[in-house]
Every structure is written in structure tokens, then in C-alpha cells.
Amino acid sequence: AQSVPWGISRVQAPAAHNRGLTGSGVKVAVLDTGISTHPDLNIRGGASFVPGEPSTQDGNGHGTHVAGTIAALNNSIGVLGVAPSAELYAVKVLGADGRGAISSIAQGLEWAGNNGMHVANLSLGSPSPSATLEQAVNSATSRGVLVVAASGNSGASSISYPARYANAMAVGATDQNNNRASFSQYGAGLDIVAPGVNVQSTYPGSTYASLNGTSMATPHVAGAAALVKQKNPSWSNVQIRNHLKNTATSLGSTNLYGSGLVNAEAATR
């Protein structure tokens, strides 16, 4: 049987699905540790930019989990994603150890721009700025990619990079009570929040796992972006980003929550 993870319900994705909005025709690149073949995922393509790891299969688990929150299939098994018909692309920029070079991430963003991706999910970050990475985010954005990135997990009152860059949409994490997760980085530049605690999703070995992190929050927003893009195919990445913020459910302090909790129902009305 298929279960609907709490975060998918909380962002009201099923209401969008009931309107026929499932992310169909929208290309979403997952810049991560790769994505493992899984019965609850449909992976359309991708590329690896990790030296020594030519396969886009996931030797870590992180990328497969992120991918499921975006687009786990609406079938009779496992879990359900925010945009179950979105086209998933596995862009490996982090190795099996979960670490990656700035150059790899920049190449992944370049690939997303070159290959017509509508959304790029970056559930990754660093406390240090990088001109190379900022340029890559700006270039991908100029080519129509909506770059969605995790705020970071140190609990600090500042946002990680690349999420902090103006052209990246920074996503923080909330818990089941719609409170900021204790680990979720916040402050200037935070755009929006989404569920990031006890998030159930796909995992390598045709299994499922529950994980915590702003990495888990980010794909809820990437998935919602795919729903909005299907409904409004002519909209630019900037229009989609602004619409997601304008339709978010306010949770109070913009410092802690940005525009609030992403709301797929309001965003697809």
C-alpha cells in the first residue's frame, strides 16, 4: 500500500493532484549524491560530475531520499511525492561520502541550464561563499532554471551558500507543529520553509527511510515549483519563486520562517 508522508499532506500537495497538477512535463534536476533505481521513482536521465563516480546511482542515500520527496510515484507502493509526474534528473555533484567540490556543483548547475531544466534542487551547502558557485547560480538562473537550495543545518542565524545568494531560493525546515526545526538556519535571505523533520521518502535498495534536515525541506519546495510550472507553463523562474512566496502560509517571523510554509494548494488555485 502507498502512504502519504506527513510533509506531503502538510504542504497540501494532494489538493493540487486532485486538480490534475502533478508536475507533468516539468524537468527537475536533483544536484546531489545521485539517485538510485527504485520502484517508486522514474528517473529520466542525468550526469555525474564526481571524479571516480561515473554512475548517477546513489552510493550515499541522500539524493534518493530528496528525489522521492519531489516525485515519488502515485502508485500502489511506498510513498508519494509533491510532484509525482515531474521528470527527475540525477545530477551527481556529491560523492558517496556526501561531500563535493564547488567545481562539481558549478558543473551540475551548468548542465541544468544547458539541458532545459525548469528546477534545480540543491539540498547542499557550505558556510563559505564562492564566486564560482555564485556565478553558476546566476548563469543557471539566467537560463531559466529555478535554483532551490537548503538553508543549512547548523541552527545558526545566517543562511548557508549557495542558498544565501540572491538568485537561489533559500528553504528552511519546520517540524510537525509548524515550528522552526532546531537545526534550521535562518535570518536574512530565508525565502520559505517546508517540512524537514521525520520526513519519510525513498532510499537505496528499494527501501524507505525517515530523515531530518533542511535537505528534506528543500524538495517540498522544488516539487511545489513543478506543480506551479505545469499550471502556468509560460511563467519564468522568477515568477514561480515569487508566486510560491506570495501563496505561502505565514508562520510569523520572517527572520525565522521567510514568507512561511510552502502551500501547494494555494499556489495552484
From Swiss-Prot:
Q: What processes in GO biological process is this protein linked to? A: proteolysis; sporulation resulting in formation of a cellular spore
Miscellaneous information on this protein: Secretion of subtilisin is associated with onset of sporulation, and many mutations which block sporulation at early stages affect expression levels of subtilisin. However, subtilisin is not necessary for normal sporulation.
Catalytic residues, per the record, are: D32, H62, S215
Annotated positions binding Ca(2+) 1: Q2, D40, L73, N75, I77, V79
Which positions bind Ca(2+) 2? A163, Y165, A168
Where's it mainly located?
Answer: secreted
Q: What is this protein called?
A: Subtilisin BL
* Similarity section: Belongs to the peptidase S8 family.
What one GO molecular function would you report for this record?
serine-type endopeptidase activity
Q: Which GO terms describe its cellular component?
A: extracellular region
Explain the purpose of this protein: Subtilisin is an extracellular alkaline serine protease, it catalyzes the hydrolysis of proteins and peptide amides.
Q: Does the keyword Hydrolase apply?
A: yes
What compartments host this protein?
Secreted
Q: Name one Pfam family in it.
A: Peptidase_S8
Q: List each copy of the Peptidase S8 domain by range.
A: 5-268
SUPFAM superfamilies membership: Subtilisin-like (SSF52743)
Its needed co-factors are:
Ca(2+)
Give the organism, scientific name. Lederbergia lenta
Q: Which reaction does it catalyse?
A: Hydrolysis of proteins with broad specificity for peptide bonds, and a preference for a large uncharged residue in P1. Hydrolyzes peptide amides
Provide the cofactor note recorded for this chain's UniProt entry.
Binds 2 calcium ions per subunit.
Keywords, ordered alphabetically:
Calcium, Hydrolase, Metal-binding, Protease, Secreted, Serine protease, Sporulation
Q: What EC designation does it have?
A: 3.4.21.62
- Respond yes or no to whether keyword Metal-binding is given for this record: yes
